[in-house]
């Protein structure tokens, strides 16, 4: 029996695909739009750690689907590249003392080698790298288009600054934790700092970003997260005049029906009104309070669980309808970045207001109740009800009616207006780091911004050995004086760089025309391929990359450069591949190499105390990262591909278990060993024909809907039937090789060549069709016995009569093996049940 030499086989076919450019795709105008397919992976950033087994999951899914569609006559575009600018690459360079240009190139080469070893059908001629000047030239150009459209501006503003990373971070890059705000990258402490920043007006597109979600085939959870992040609120903006001042406090509310329950106003600690309106004898306390609150995170300030704090300004506003005086407070739970940075305190009908009023002994006035009568409140009443304690024309009405009447009164008397607000903030687009796209802006002697011309692009990132970030907020580029100052012109360059998200905002478009020096992509090619039909990647990019790229795409659509309103038609989030880890009694996870197994129990080597096995994310610190290179060496790329898809539904998280891949490896060996049987052109038995069509049907339907695990299961069941036959029937084996090929392309190519066909299978075959009429319906399991002892089980149609049962049993390989040199006394066949052969 010849050994399944997977290493040799996989190397052979990877070289064949490379040398023959098997997966290179060109635009063919004769192929109709409905037969074109653009499949995309979220491209990787090339970290020094290389791939772990979690990374190939999404890539394998797109590869299987792309190959399947290719075999079904589709013109498939499936490109790959590298998101190579940004913090991860720069941090690695700083840690190792290697320039990011050098380390990034080295890491890309490592990634490419690993990706190619998995046998993915990428068109490598379309490879892109976001740090390549021929790529970022167009990132800079798109920025200038945003600038010309008035969507990019510079301003001094409070921003999240991370001293450890040495840069400003966008709101989306901050994680709010009970211990304060942290950077998403590295989980470092961050602080608020006033710096001049470039900002993109993503808020101008808030409504369209929200509404167009309805057109997308995306997971509902992702759409809901984007809706919440955009945070649309419809309500009314009310003007409150301030006693002794010309200024007004503008308050946005979605509950104008509670306006008569206002007993105080609260403004944010960041409000510029504080200095103007605070009475002298209150200033000391106010300034102390404001300084203290600046250090807190938004989450901590607004959390219902946290104690509400505030301070009185000594000033009053007037109620817009009753003209009553209302005290003006400063409160921690009001954010300057949301709405107008002020709220009306209605403690009877808002829980935060209720807590605040209780703490500072402020009046609580209910104006809505369930019964229409005054009731004692233990907490804020937030339900619908009947209005009470309100002026006559607003009293004793449903609160929905009060809402309409209040809005009408405010508009009529010019005390307010209907308004829509969003939680979404403009995108802070500059970073004080070296390894990023230089922003193509000059400043004249007066500080006015002057955009570069298209002919001046790319503005190249200057080479420097001193690329480490400062801890003061200045960019490393500011230290390169001969680059910053344009000789004899009086102009200086912008020294901030773009964030790591810039290059990924539009990369799917550059794949369409990656070597075009005149434009980011020709309109003809954009119209040929767009939109992306299937996009697979992690859910962690929901409010970062996915939102940003939608924004840029809509701008390009408005400018007439792209033909679709949305970039990604269908999105799938693959689940996380986790790993086993070990947890001590106190909940602390310990590295896997500190654990020993005794009698199916696990113990910490250091103290010999029992630990429990748990599922955790793969991490270097826990020593539970699985390197795909090791798995490929031991079991092969086809094994890892099939195992990752067989572990469970694509969208589920599931733990890696190397023991599980052994079963997949056995499955591939079973297929390989079919070569040992006679390859027969005889007509196959109808039972195996039926089983084949059943398998084709299942694999076709499940691959189409990305249910890869059940498609693999169907192939495993079929192979178990196939190996029962003495011969390997060509008319059965050939179509099976084709349905196997998207999942195990190397093995399939080798078997395709073995049966005498011309490689590549992916260019010289088509997906087999199934015939419903040939699929056994209402099948029954038939037990095959010799002298009453079971030797095998087979599935047969309920219509199979006794004589056919006998004939099939006598042709069964396991039965035949047991009948050698034996005398058959009689054969007993019972329809839909068994065949028993009596021998002596």
Swiss-Prot record:
GO CC terms, sorted: cytosol
GO molecular function, one term: ATP binding
Compartments reported by the entry: Cytoplasm
Root EC class: ligase
Protease keyword on record: no
UniProt keywords, alphabetically: Aminoacyl-tRNA synthetase, ATP-binding, Cytoplasm, Ligase, Nucleotide-binding, Protein biosynthesis
Catalyzed chemical reaction(s): tRNA(Leu) + L-leucine + ATP = L-leucyl-tRNA(Leu) + AMP + diphosphate
Domain of life: Bacteria
E.C. number(s) listed in UniProt: 6.1.1.4
UniProt short sequence motif 'HIGH' region, positions renumbered to this chain: 44-55
Gene Ontology biological process: leucyl-tRNA aminoacylation
Binding site for ATP: 620
Record SUPFAM superfamilies: Anticodon-binding domain of a subclass of class I aminoacyl-tRNA synthetases (SSF47323), Nucleotidylyl transferase (SSF52374), ValRS/IleRS/LeuRS editing domain (SSF50677)
Pfam families from the UniProt entry: Anticodon_1 (PF08264), tRNA-synt_1 (PF00133), tRNA-synt_1_2 (PF13603), tRNA-synt_1g (PF09334)
Motif 'KMSKS' region: chain residues: 617-621
Coiled coil segments of this chain: none
Chief place of localization: cytoplasm
Record PANTHER family: LEUCINE--TRNA LIGASE, MITOCHONDRIAL (PTHR43740:SF2), LEUCYL-TRNA SYNTHETASE (PTHR43740)
Family (UniProt): Belongs to the class-I aminoacyl-tRNA synthetase family.
Protein name stated in the entry: Leucine--tRNA ligase
